[in-house]
């Protein structure tokens, strides 16, 4: 059955069907092939369209992906950064949404509260794309599962391990994506983290697993979790916007859940490693140096600036994080085109 997403918002993946999610993944792959063949140069279906990308949280990949994707499609882009809008401060989100909806054909929002995305959807009158909230990261997940499909083809019954802070937006979104693709997902980290996953989201995922196949389980043993895994995925232990003081607590909780070569060796020979980036895998950033200096003696695991993944894994051929990063652009192009183009 043909999929028509024109006029739809990507506020949450859970508002989409399995067929619609699969369509976005497949279209992303097709658009990537077209880009590599140079076919986008004379095919700009969104000439005359304009989009706004509204950021409460800065991001290299999300901003660049939206700007390049829109440019390839022929659309104009306005970037509104954290200091460029009074939304929620001097002007209500409702009023901001109504104004932006008069100017633009679509709005990307990257920030904190899912309720802000919901308000933009409700009041703007145009498609809204969730570039990240505290609850979910749907544009990232389309790119992630695109990357997996490029590697493995059919994802049904493939095994993915999300290790570390699996209760965060990327961990929860990975669980949702696995449910749409009939995969077996293991959420590996502290046992009490599972109690922090929204019960409604969990219930919807379980229903999707029943319908699409695959399974969900939780583990506190990273080697057992990694056995026969096709994909190992992790994210930072402290997210952008959270205080530096939180590193001590999180490292204490997650020190046994670092992705290392022991995990890789426990998985399948062709296992791929994914990370939405940026990653703390060495001491080449001011943050990782500060963590190593401040907490390296207390937690030797971070003494070299490595946190959620070792540099050995990150520099290995298993690492597909940069393919994944590139695919942000192709998948976002698919999302924009599907919702304001066709």
Curated annotation (Swiss-Prot):
Pathway where it operates:
Amino-acid degradation; L-arginine degradation via ADI pathway; carbamoyl phosphate from L-arginine: step 2/2
Q: What is its EC number?
A: 2.1.3.3
Q: Which GO terms describe its biological process?
A: arginine biosynthetic process via ornithine; arginine catabolic process to ornithine; citrulline biosynthetic process
Subcellular localization: Cytoplasm
Q: What GO MF annotations does this protein's record show?
A: amino acid binding; ornithine carbamoyltransferase activity
Q: Does the keyword Chloroplast apply?
A: no
Annotated HAMAP family: OTCase (MF_01109)
Subunit and interaction comment: Dodecamer (tetramer of trimers).
Its name, as the record gives it, is Ornithine carbamoyltransferase, catabolic
Q: Which organism is it from?
A: Malacoplasma penetrans (strain HF-2) (Mycoplasma penetrans)
């Amino acid at each position: 059955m043909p999929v028509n997403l024109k006029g739809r918002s990507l506020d949450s993946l859970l508002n989409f069907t399995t067929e619609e999610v699969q369509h976005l993944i497949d279209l992303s792959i097709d658009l990537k092939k077209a880009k590599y063949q140079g076919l986008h140069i004379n095919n700009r279906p969104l000439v005359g369209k304009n989009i706004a990308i509204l950021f409460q949280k800065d991001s290299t990949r999300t901003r660049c992906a939206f700007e390049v994707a829109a440019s390839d499609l022929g659309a104009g882009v306005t970037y509104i950064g954290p200091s460029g809008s009074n939304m929620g401060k001097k002007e209500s989100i409702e009023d901001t949404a109504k104004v932006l909806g008069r100017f633009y054909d679509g709005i990307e929002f990257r920030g904190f509260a899912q309720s802000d995305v919901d308000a933009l959807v409700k009041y703007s009158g145009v498609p809204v794309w969730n570039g990240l909230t505290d609850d979910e990261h749907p544009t990232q997940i389309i790119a992630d599962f695109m990357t997996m499909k490029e590697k493995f083809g059919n994802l049904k019954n493939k095994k993915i391990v999300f290790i570390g802070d699996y209760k965060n937006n990327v961990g929860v979104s990975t669980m949702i994506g696995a449910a749409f693709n009939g995969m077996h997902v293991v959420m590996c980290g502290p046992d009490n983290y599972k109690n922090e996953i929204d019960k409604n989201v969990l219930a919807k995922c379980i229903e999707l697993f029943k319908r699409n196949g695959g399974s969900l389980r939780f583990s506190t043993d990273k080697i057992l979790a990694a056995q026969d895994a096709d994909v190992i995925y992790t994210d930072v232990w402290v997210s952008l916007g959270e205080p530096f003081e939180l590193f001590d607590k999180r490292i204490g909780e997650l020190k046994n859940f670092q992705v290392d070569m022991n995990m890789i060796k426990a998985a399948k020979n062709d296992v791929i490693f994914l990370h939405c980036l940026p990653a703390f895998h060495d001491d080449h950033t001011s943050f990782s140096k500060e963590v190593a200096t401040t907490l390296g003696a207390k937690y030797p695991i971070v003494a070299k600036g490595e946190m959620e993944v070792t540099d050995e894994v990150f520099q290995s051929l298993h690492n597909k994080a940069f393919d994944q990063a590139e695919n942000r652009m192709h998948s976002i192009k698919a999302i924009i085109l599907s919702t304001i183009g066709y």
